[in-house]
């Protein structure tokens, strides 16, 4: 009898193990109460205490707001800083430098308009994307993209001249219009290369195309107007590459491109410019907001390695880390490379960016637009 009681007491001590007290040190999980009516601000605020990816999105909102709220005046002046850097007004004017990276599919989607809003109001400082993130923005100024379905048969769509991007449809005519628009611009750029010795980099090409499109629905137009650099090291990986390929036969030597390759684009100039954006951030903190993975994610992170890592990082993507891909890697992996600082504020939101990013912007950049409009225009 006594032995049985001892066994039961041992079992009870295992099952009913005493807990650490989390009261006051951890967020209590509770969702939004719709009995209080529909209040979107409170609904979004409640995500932080909902759990799972809603909580991660809540953390992302908090971190981006920390990026936007940071001023150099929050830090103690260094012993070797200049007189200007000691000036109180100057220190209050210095904000976090924000790098925004995103993949092309997001420009194909309606997230393009969210990106345009940020660039239009100078809420980000550096943009990195893929070739599709450039061309899709320009093409949408010429012709629209339409909603389709993920399950539409590829062979049927091909017979109709319709290209599918997930559940979006892009008529092939859009690319024909793009060719008609861009080739004369490439002709002009080639003439400037020959006669004026202009050395084109991807970012210079992008700025020129943005100037020529002259359309306020384009985020590239606003980047050009606001002098926000847009980097794309993979500029040839898309329709832009197709156009450059065709143009090289038109202006270059079709039989011996070594003698005359046509329009030349220098990628080394841009890697210097991109890395310099991080290196010369100086006393500013840097923040990374990266939508999707691949080239933009790595390019932004790698540039920040040049300054011993970013101070804030928000990733939004659905990629998994277990195949070793950079796309799926969590922020902590970037810490091991020196791309994010050890004490940085970071989060990865495992979610489709078309869902998460507009909510994030609503609760951060858009909510703070009035207070940001003055100070970020001075940066």
UniProtKB/Swiss-Prot annotation:
Binding site for NAD(+): 104-108, 130-132, 136, 237, 293, 318-319, 352-353
Similarity annotation: Belongs to the deoxyhypusine synthase family.
Matching PANTHER family: DEOXYHYPUSINE SYNTHASE (PTHR11703:SF0)
EC numbers for this chain: 2.5.1.46
Subunit structure, interactors included: Homotetramer.
Job description of the protein: Catalyzes the NAD-dependent oxidative cleavage of spermidine and the subsequent transfer of the butylamine moiety of spermidine to the epsilon-amino group of a specific lysine residue of the eIF-5A precursor protein to form the intermediate deoxyhypusine residue. Also able to produce homospermidine from putrescine.
Keywords for the protein's UniProt record, in alphabetical order: Hypusine biosynthesis, NAD, Transferase
Pathway: Protein modification; eIF5A hypusination
One Pfam family hit: DS
Entry annotation: catalytic residues: 339
SUPFAM superfamilies: DHS-like NAD/FAD-binding domain
Cellular component terms (Gene Ontology): cytoplasm
Name of this chain's protein: Deoxyhypusine synthase
Enzyme class at the top of the EC tree: transferase
Cofactor(s) the record lists: NAD(+)
GO biological process: spermidine metabolic process
Molecular function terms, GO-annotated: deoxyhypusine synthase activity
List of residues binding spermidine: 135-136, 242, 298, 324-326, 333-339
């Amino acid at each position: 009898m006594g032995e049985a009681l001892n066994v039961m007491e041992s079992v009870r001590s295992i099952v009913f193990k005493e807990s650490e007290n989390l009261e006051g040190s951890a967020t209590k999980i509770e969702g939004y109460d719709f009995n209080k009516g529909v209040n979107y601000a409170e609904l979004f605020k409640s995500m932080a205490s909902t759990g799972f990816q809603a909580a991660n999105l809540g953390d992302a909102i908090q971190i981006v707001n920390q990026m936007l709220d940071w001023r150099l005046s929050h830090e103690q002046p260094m012993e070797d800083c200049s007189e200007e850097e000691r000036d109180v007004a100057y220190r209050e004017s210095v904000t976090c430098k924000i790098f925004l990276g995103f993949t092309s599919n997001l420009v194909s989607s309606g997230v393009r308009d969210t990106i345009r809003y940020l660039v239009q109001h100078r809420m980000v400082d550096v943009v990195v994307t893929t070739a599709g993130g450039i061309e899709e923005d320009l093409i949408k100024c010429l012709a629209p993209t339409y909603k389709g379905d993920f399950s539409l048969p590829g062979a049927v769509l091909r017979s109709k001249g319709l290209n599918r991007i997930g559940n979006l449809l892009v008529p092939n005519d859009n690319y024909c219009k793009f060719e008609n628009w861009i080739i004369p611009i490439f002709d002009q750029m080639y003439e400037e290369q020959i006669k004026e010795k202009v050395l084109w980099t991807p970012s210079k090409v992008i700025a020129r195309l943005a100037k020529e499109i002259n359309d306020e629905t384009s985020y590239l137009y606003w980047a050009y107007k606001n002098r926000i650099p847009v980097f794309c090291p993979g500029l040839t990986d898309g329709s832009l590459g197709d156009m450059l390929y065709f143009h090289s036969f038109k202006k270059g030597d079709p039989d011996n491109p070594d003698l005359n390759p046509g329009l030349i684009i220098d990628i080394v100039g841009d890697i210097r410019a991109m890395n310099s954006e991080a290196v010369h951030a100086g006393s500013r903190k840097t923040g990374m907001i990266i939508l999707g993975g691949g080239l933009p994610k790595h390019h932004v992170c790698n540039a920040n390695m040049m300054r011993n890592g970013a101070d804030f990082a928000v990733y939004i993507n659905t990629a998994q880390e277990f195949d070793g891909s950079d796309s799926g890697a969590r922020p902590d992996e970037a810490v091991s490379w020196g791309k994010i600082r050890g004490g940085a504020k970071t989060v990865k939101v495992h979610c489709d960016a078309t869902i998460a990013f507009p909510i994030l912007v609503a609760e951060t950049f858009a909510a703070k637009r009035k207070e940001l409009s003055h100070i970020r225009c001075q940066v």
